[in-house]
UniProtKB/Swiss-Prot annotation:
Highest classification ranks of the organism: Eukaryota, Metazoa, Chordata, Craniata, Vertebrata
Native source species: Homo sapiens (Human)
Any one Gene Ontology cellular component term annotated for this protein: synapse
The protein, known as: Voltage-dependent L-type calcium channel subunit beta-1
InterPro entries, A to Z: CAB1-4_N_A-dom (IPR046937), GK/Ca_channel_bsu (IPR008145), P-loop_NTPase (IPR027417), SH3-like_dom_sf (IPR036028), SH3_domain (IPR001452), VDCC_L_b1su (IPR005443), VDCC_L_bsu (IPR000584)
Subcellular location: Cell membrane, Sarcolemma; Cell membrane
Tissue: Detected in heart ventricle (at protein level). Isoform 1 and isoform 3 are expressed in brain, heart, spleen, central nervous system and neuroblastoma cells. Isoform 2 is expressed in skeletal muscle.
Gene that encodes it: CACNB1
Acidic residues bias: start-end ranges: 548-559
SMART domains the record matches: GuKc (SM00072)
Family listed: Belongs to the calcium channel beta subunit family.
Length: 598
């Protein structure tokens, strides 16, 4: 019974082995695959695993294969183009050394070149700080100009244009925002950040100061266009129009015209150039307020004088201004003239009082006004002045001034540039103005248009600089609607005879100084007697004497009866025909020879 049951359950004979397929009815299942992954005795893997590894190795080799010939040729072409562009940039840079200065700018921002700035020639970019002065020779492209830093020993290089500086500023601001975002995310778990979030408090920030700071940074352009040569303006020791100040300033002007003969233009400015603020002349709504106010000069007259100063500076000669209305450096701080402020300083108020009293009763009755003006100048920080002349002796003061101006002359006339012929430049400037009467407009605003064009541009040989004013939104050669029509046609350089013949009250716009002419250009009031061209006007003033007292005596001989003119400044050139103001010689004996400070 037992055997029968066992025989019925087992279909195979007892002597036959049981095949392994009975326990694994699906030989292609997951167990067989796992079996294939086992290593053999020699350490190698199964056949299907080995074949897969061969496929993976082949795909990895495809990434590390050598570049194709097309990639190599493309890279070589790029390198060749880069070298060719760099060679052309160097050639253009070399040619620009002998080209005239197209215009000058004063920087409001600093720039330090970095490798990522895409300079046309690496290592030839100009580094500058805020309030530096740059002479621009020409435009290289929309991103770069060619020019030099006005400093002795500096050569021409590439200067970023306002467009380039704005793009660099935007990139820097974007990086700062990203850094702040990353730092704020990483600091979210800090106790201070959590405390701010939970309590809902914010760190106190004065909103008014933040708005003012934002406004000041938004509206400041990178460059201000200034005259190619900074004009020299004398202030102090007191108010202009009074004899003590006029006498001491005249002594310095006489020294300048003899020391820098052929290199300086001295001109008188009667208009109130302190009105030439960018905020006023760029805002038409303020024009009506200025015109309605009881000001000495109209805006049209002020603008005409500014243009004349820019035109004088084009020749790269020194320019000295006898500005009637300028008695304090703050009057010109917001204009684009960027003058060299020379402060004639009298340290002791007692010395100034004695000098004023020595001029007679007509000056003594204005003693308090002059003393107050002197004290106001003395309160200014030294940074507001470029030169402070506090020497006792006239000769020492003159040498101090000459040393500064000689250094400035070397900074503006590098040895690499061809020395220009001022007489030839002035003659050609006359022809250039006649050919194109509309001056190039100012980069910074619509009012400082000097007609600043290279000689090649005036003759049509080189026109690459035509586009540079448009980069800041002002088309070249055009004035805004607020500019009086026909103003540019009145700006012209006159010959010596034209200057003398035009010696009339309305000839300020064309009063130029010619080479070799030691007399400055002055306008004659009809009530003042003979003009510059009159033989009765006398010869040129004598050369600089040894002390301030000697200059005072010369000043007395040349002083005419100007009391009818109020506070207008006395002339530089000697004039006869007018009565000489008397003074008490005994009152001057207390003023020692050459001692005017202590």
């Amino acid at each position: 019974m037992v055997q029968k049951t066992s025989m019925s359950r087992g279909p195979y004979p007892p002597s036959q082995e049981i095949p392994m397929e009975v326990f694994d009815p699906s030989p292609q299942g997951k167990y067989s695959k796992r079996k294939g992954r086992f290593k053999r005795s020699d350490g190698s893997t199964s056949s299907d695993t080995t074949s897969n590894s061969f496929v993976r190795q082949g795909s990895a080799e495809s990434y590390t294969s050598r570049p194709s010939d097309s990639d190599v040729s493309l890279e070589e072409d790029r390198e060749a183009l880069r070298k060719e562009a760099e060679r052309q940039a160097l050639a253009q840079l070399e040619k620009a050394k002998t080209k005239p200065v197209a215009f000058a700018v004063r920087t409001n921002v600093g720039y330090n070149p970095s490798p990522g700035d895409e300079v046309p020639v690496q290592g030839v970019a100009i580094t500058f700080e805020p309030k530096d002065f740059l002479h621009i020779k020409e435009k290289y492209n929309n991103d770069w100009w060619i020019g030099r830093l006005v400093k002795e020993g500096c050569e021409v290089g590439f200067i970023p244009s306002p467009v380039k500086l704005d793009s660099l500023r935007l990139l820097q601001e974007q990086k700062l925002r990203q850094n702040r975002l990353g730092s704020s995310k990483s600091g979210d778990n800090s106790s201070s950040s959590l405390g701010d979030v939970v309590t809902g408090t914010r760190r106190p920030t004065p909103p008014a100061s933040a708005k003012q700071k934002q406004k000041s940074t938004e509206h400041v352009p990178p460059y201000d266009v200034v005259p190619s040569m900074r004009p020299i303006i004398l202030v102090g020791p007191s108010l202009k129009g009074y004899e003590v100040t006029d006498m001491m300033q005249k002594a310095l002007f006489d020294f300048l015209k003899h020391r820098f003969d052929g290199r300086i233009s001295i001109t008188r400015v009667t208009a109130d150039i302190s009105l030439a603020k960018r905020s006023v002349l760029n805002n038409p709504s303020k024009h009506i307020i200025i015109e309605r106010s009881n000001t000495r000069s109209s805006l049209a007259e002020v603008q005409s004088e500014i243009e004349r100063i820019f035109e004088l500076a084009r020749t790269l000669q020194l320019v000295a201004l006898d500005a009637d209305t300028i008695n304090h450096p703050a009057q010109l701080s917001k204009t684009s003239l960027a003058p060299i402020i020379v402060y004639i300083k009298i340290t002791s108020p007692k010395v100034l009082q004695r000098l004023i009293k020595s001029r007679g009763k007509s000056q003594s009755k204005h003693l308090n006004v002059q003393i107050a003006a002197s004290e106001k100048l003395a309160q200014c920080p030294p940074e507001m002045f470029d030169i402070i002349l506090d020497e006792n002796q006239l000769e020492d003061a003159c040498e101090h001034l000459a040393e500064y101006l000689e250094a400035y002359w070397k900074a503006t006339h590098p040895p690499s540039s061809t020395p220009p012929n001022p007489l030839l430049n002035r003659t050609m400037a006359t022809a250039a103005l006649a050919a194109s009467p509309a001056p190039v407009s100012n980069l910074q605003g619509p009012y400082l248009a000097s007609g600043d064009q290279p000689l090649e541009r005036a003759t049509g040989e080189h026109a690459s600089m035509h586009e540079y004013p448009g980069e800041l939104g002002q088309p070249p050669g055009l004035y805004p609607s607020s500019h009086p029509p026909g103003r540019a046609g009145t700006l012209r350089a006159l010959s010596r005879q034209d200057t003398f013949d035009a010696d009339t009250p309305g000839s300020r716009n064309s009063a130029y100084t010619e080479l070799g002419d030691s007399c400055v250009d002055m306008e004659t009031d009809p009530s003042e007697g003979p003009g510059l061209g009159d033989p009765a006007g006398g010869g040129t003033p004598p050369a600089r004497q040894g002390s301030w007292e000697d200059e005072e005596e010369d000043y007395e001989e040349e002083l005419t009866d100007n009391r009818n003119r109020g506070r207008n400044k006395a002339r530089y050139c000697a004039e006869g025909g007018g009565p000489v103001l008397g003074r008490n010689k005994n009152e001057l004996e207390g003023w020692g020879r050459g001692v005017y400070i202590r």
